[in-house]
Amino acid sequence: AVFGNVTIPLREDLSLFLGGRYSVLDKPYNYIGSTNALGAPLVFAPFTTSSGSTLKEFDPKITLEKTFDNALGWVTYTTATKSGGPGFAQWNAADASKPYEAEELEMIEFGYKAVLNDGATQVEAILYTYDYTDHQQILVGTNSQGQPAGVVVNGDATINGVELSYRTYLNENTNLALSYAGIDAEWDRFMDPRTTPSTDRAGEKMAFAPENSINLALENVQYLNIGELTSAISIVYKDKYKLALVDWEPTTVDDLTLVNLTVGLDTPSGWNISAFCNNCTDDEYKMVALSGVRAQGGGNRYGFGDGRRIGLQLSTDF
């Protein structure tokens, strides 16, 4: 890969950033399947195949940046590429010799950041749009023999979002941070091959994309004779989102609110004594989910996030 950039001052308060990266991604591979039970799933017979993918790509980055008295505004255009490659869990030479397609991304971002109240307050706002072509999705599907196998499906998607943040000192000991993220992530083209016939998921929401997320953090520091006492609370809220392509109960996370508390004392002698409570409301929520292949009987596997955890910690540096 070769990359470079230059910043061109247009005016005292206006500059243009031009950058680019040219890369050649070559992925040759050998795929070997072996078995000690001929004719039995999943590898019916031993095989060896060789294939690969080559990608030559130039990705530019252009940013126009304007400074104000206590603020900064910018607009950025950039592209990115993720190369294709060998599939996973392939049980025959025909399937193993087919690499999946490269993924392309085109992004536009508008941003504004300001420092207020003599540096005590900072606000930031970002608007962005991501345009994906051949976005890679790793699924569990079936091969030509109807056996479960790894599938990488490429689809087009558009993600539009807004991020707002506000950070300030309420007084010399207490700081507050508040942020909001809104996301509209939707498939423009996606054929799900795991059903018969395949399911067209164009217009459906993407996974791991709650439409609204809010983060609140409050921290207070007291300087005592026995050391520095820090107390903090953080609250995270996300509205309903899904963990997989299919939006149904085993793969859906309902409105989620997580509350964490910490109190810690740093002593002059270098010791830290802290107490913590993570997920204090003991919300039950899924972290990951995997939908089985319906042709193989379906089923789901999912893992939960940590429940309420309360503890004490003693540490020192030496």
Regions found by a protein language model. Give the residues of each.
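Signature of Gram-negative outer-membrane beta-barrel scaffolds
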Residues: 1-68, 84
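Residues on the lipid-exposed face of transmembrane beta-strands in outer-membrane beta-barrel proteins
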Residues: 2-8, 54, 62-66, 110-114, ...
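Gram-negative outer-membrane beta-barrel transporters
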Residues: 12-16, 129-131, 152-245, 315-317
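Repeated loop/turn-to-beta-strand initiation elements of outer-membrane beta-barrel proteins
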Residues: 13-16, 70-73, 118-123, 173-176, ...
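Transmembrane beta-barrel strands of outer-membrane/channel proteins
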Residues: 18-22, 75-79, 112, 123-129, ...
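Membrane-embedded beta-barrel scaffold of Gram-negative outer-membrane proteins
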Residues: 67-82, 99-169, 181, 185-188
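C-terminal beta-signal and adjacent terminal beta-strands/loops
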Residues: 176, 236-244, 265-318
